[in-house]
C-alpha cells in the first residue's frame, strides 16, 4: 500500500516522552484502540514521501490533552524518538470501523460542498471537524456568497441534525439549515 488514498491518519507525533523511546501522539481518531491495542501501524514522514511499517507495543491515554503516549518496538531511546517528531501515524483505510447510521468518518466529510437547504445556494466547503461540546464543521465560505472578500472566511457550524439534516456522501454534499446570523459570525 503506497497510495495516500489507502491510508487513514490516526495521529501525529508531537514529541518524545521520557528516555526509553516513548512518543507523544496527538490523536486524530475517535478510536482509542488504535493507540492502546498492540499491533502493526505505519509511519509517514513529514514530507509524505515514505511510509514504514512499525510495531505498536503499548499505548496509554493522557487525560485532558487528546494525547497518547505510545511505545514502538523499533524505537529504543529518546534520541531515536526525537527524530520522529511530525511523523504521521497511519492505519490502512480497510481498518475503518463500521459506523452506525448518522455517524461519519471525519475524512469523508472533508471537502464536501455545503448548501443552504432552503435556498439551494452553495455556501462553501468543509475544511475540518473540531471537537467541542458538539462536533463543529469548519466551512470555508465561497467568495461568491457576498460582495465582501470572504476568500479567507471560515465559519463553524454545529454538526447536529437540526442544523445539518442532510449528509450525502455519494453526491459529496451537505445541506444545512443555519440559524439566523450563523454564517455572518466569522
From Swiss-Prot:
Keyword list, A-Z: Chaperone, Cytoplasm, Ribosome biogenesis, rRNA processing
Example GO biological process: ribosomal small subunit biogenesis
Keyword rRNA processing belongs to the record: yes
Localization (cell): Cytoplasm
Domain PRC barrel: 100-182
KW rRNA processing (keyword) present: yes
GO molecular function term, any single one: ribosome binding
UniProt superkingdom: Bacteria
GO cellular component: cytoplasm; ribosome
Pfam families attached to this UniProt entry: PRC, RimM
Domain notes: The PRC barrel domain binds ribosomal protein uS19.
Function, as annotated: An accessory protein needed during the final step in the assembly of 30S ribosomal subunit, possibly for assembly of the head region. Essential for efficient processing of 16S rRNA. May be needed both before and after RbfA during the maturation of 16S rRNA. It has affinity for free ribosomal 30S subunits but not for 70S ribosomes.
Similarity-based family: Belongs to the RimM family.
Protein name per the record: Ribosome maturation factor RimM
Amino acid at each position: 500500500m503506497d497510495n495516500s488514498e489507502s491510508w487513514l491518519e490516526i495521529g501525529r507525533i508531537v514529541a518524545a516522552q521520557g528516555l526509553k523511546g516513548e512518543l507523544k501522539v496527538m490523536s486524530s481518531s475517535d478510536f482509542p484502540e488504535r493507540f492502546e491495542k498492540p499491533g502493526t501501524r505505519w509511519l509517514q514522514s513529514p514530507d509524505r514521501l515514505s511510509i514504514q511499517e512499525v510495531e505498536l507495543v503499548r499505548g496509554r491515554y493522557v487525560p485532558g490533552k487528546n494525547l497518547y503516549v505510545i511505545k514502538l518496538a523499533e524505537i529504543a531511546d529518546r534520541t531515536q524518538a526525537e527524530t520522529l517528531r511530525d511523523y504521521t501515524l497511519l492505519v490502512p483505510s480497510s481498518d475503518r470501523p463500521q459506523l452506525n447510521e448518522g455517524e461519519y468518518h471525519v475524512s469523508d466529510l472533508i471537502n464536501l460542498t455545503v448548501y443552504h437547504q432552503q435556498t439551494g445556494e452553495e455556501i462553501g466547503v468543509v475544511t475540518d471537524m473540531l471537537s467541542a461540546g458538539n462536533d463543529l464543521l469548519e466551512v470555508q465560505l465561497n467568495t461568491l456568497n457576498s460582495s465582501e472578500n470572504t476568500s479567507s472566511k471560515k465559519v463553524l457550524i454545529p454538526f447536529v441534525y437540526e442544523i445539518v439534516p442532510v449528509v450525502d456522501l455519494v453526491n459529496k454534499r451537505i445541506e444545512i439549515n443555519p440559524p439566523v446570523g450563523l454564517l455572518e459570525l466569522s
